[in-house]
């Protein structure tokens, strides 16, 4: 977390001359500023939003579903920034059998004036990078038959830049490995709703209101169990596991294109050591909690050797830029601080 703190400070310096707000979007299993008391996703023991604000920046932190799909997360981010009732879209909600406009997801807006004349910089970590690109995709397109503020019309120019840190632009082999060896994990998420109204949600909220997983007051546990057991979330592609997989990321990359009017910055990271056989093992700077997944990625035979270098969760090669299924990559170049045009 310390290294990310300094990365954020260096990124912020790029925006020092322009008074454009900065939006922070967390990654997979992330949390908001009012959760995990005393420990911030952005900054650890230091509240990065508060610190950057004290330095003269206008900064806002969104809190989106920690295990939700990028479509759902992007919609949540939009309404948290702009303000209004979250609306996942009629056709998307019908396709995946979710609540289109969940109660409790209506916001005053962190930056209500957001539009093409008042764009934002978006800084992200991990899955947050995919979420930002999905938000950009939704803003740039008009979806026929939709009436929501986000989906009904094109909104070009609303984003000035997108910065990604350790983002699985092309997915992570870890998602594939977990789905293969631990398929029950996604099935278990159906029962996370039982925590929604408990003290646990005050510390960490899975934010799955759209899936209607909450136990009703007059509902017996057996009825609740039967209802939730049949929830489509267990096998749905409207979920982080699909978006973070190599196949899911590739599917999104095929419909996504970068915008020549938007600046993109990607910060690939790693914390492994290469061995003679081209496999990778964790270095001493990596958290012990990430050693097991890091070794799974670093020794996987399901990918080329270049995918073995990783940060414990994502292969470094996947963090650079999006690549489509035909092998075509989005325009990219090595960062030059003297020339960012």
Task: Please identify what each model-predicted range represents.
Residues 4-13:
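Sec-dependent N-terminal signal peptides
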Residues 8, 55, 228-229:
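Generic alpha-helical secondary structure signal
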Residues 10, 21, 122, 292, ...:
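N-terminal hydrophobic or amphipathic segments with adjacent small-residue motifs
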Residues 16-123, 127-186:
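N-terminal non-catalytic accessory region
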Residues 137, 141-341:
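Helical cap/lid subdomain of alpha/beta-hydrolase-fold lipid enzymes
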